[in-house]
Each structure stands twice: as C-alpha cells, then as structure tokens.
C-alpha cells in the first residue's frame, strides 16, 4: 500500500527530458538564486555519469573552464533544472567515463554518431 502511494506521488513529479546517455555533449539550463533574483545559468559539457534511480536520477556533466576541469552533478527531475539540450552524441563503450578526466587534447576526442530524432524518456 505504501509503495503504491509513494509511486503515485513520485510519478507526479517526474519531468520529461530528451533521451541522453554518457558520452553525449549536453547544455543544462539551471536556475540559480542570487539574493532575491532568479536567473538561468547554462552549463555545457560531456555527460560522464548517468544514474537512473526513479525520482532521484542524477547525471554528472564535465567541462574544461580556463584549463581546469569542472564537474557538476544535477538531479534529473529537480525543479531547478529548467531544460536539457543534447548538442551531439558520441560513441562510447562504457557507462561511466571517469577515464576522460585524465585525458586532454586529441586523446579526449570521441567519435560522433548520428542519432534519429531524440525521444523523450
């Protein structure tokens, strides 16, 4: 009984996003609060981890900013995540791309794949 009730409550909070996976370059529009103002900040980078766990699904995006690697974890169904855009899809053979942290320059390139129209999750 309680499991069904929790499932019903969680299903009302799940949001639809385009389908993406580790290895994809994404642009995340994230709401941040500065004082009493709210603005949208864009974080663009490579998805190195994606964990599907119902309402607490999360993903990690990594980018290089001023020659320093920056990683940020986002909750997929958070109300602070405004939208997620897939910029390009890359061919990878792993679920977690932690090895990309050590790479730079040409060794950090990934092979791009063409995908059909992206479907919602």
UniProtKB/Swiss-Prot annotation:
Pfam families: Ribosomal_L19. PROSITE patterns: RIBOSOMAL_L19 (PS01015). GO terms for cellular component: cytosolic large ribosomal subunit. Keywords: Ribonucleoprotein, Ribosomal protein. GO terms for biological process: translation. Belongs to the bacterial ribosomal protein bL19 family. This protein is located at the 30S-50S ribosomal subunit interface and may play a role in the structure and function of the aminoacyl-tRNA binding site. This is Large ribosomal subunit protein bL19. It comes from Mesomycoplasma hyopneumoniae (strain 7448) (Mycoplasma hyopneumoniae). The lineage of its organism: Bacteria, Bacillati, Mycoplasmatota, Mycoplasmoidales, Metamycoplasmataceae. The gene is rplS.
């Amino acid at each position: 009984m309680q499991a069904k009730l929790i499932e019903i409550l969680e299903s009302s909070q799940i949001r639809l996003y385009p389908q993406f996976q580790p290895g994809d370059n994404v642009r995340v529009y994230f709401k941040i609060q500065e004082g009493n103002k709210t603005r949208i900040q864009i974080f663009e980078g490579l998805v190195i981890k994606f964990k599907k766990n119902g309402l607490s699904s999360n993903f990690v995006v990594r980018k290089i900013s001023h020659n320093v690697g920056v990683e940020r974890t986002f909750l997929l169904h958070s109300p602070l995540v405004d939208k997620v855009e897939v910029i390009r899809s890359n061919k990878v053979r792993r679920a977690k791309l932690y090895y990309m942290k050590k790479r730079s320059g040409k060794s950090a390139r990934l092979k791009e794949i063409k995908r059909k129209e992206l479907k919602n999750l």
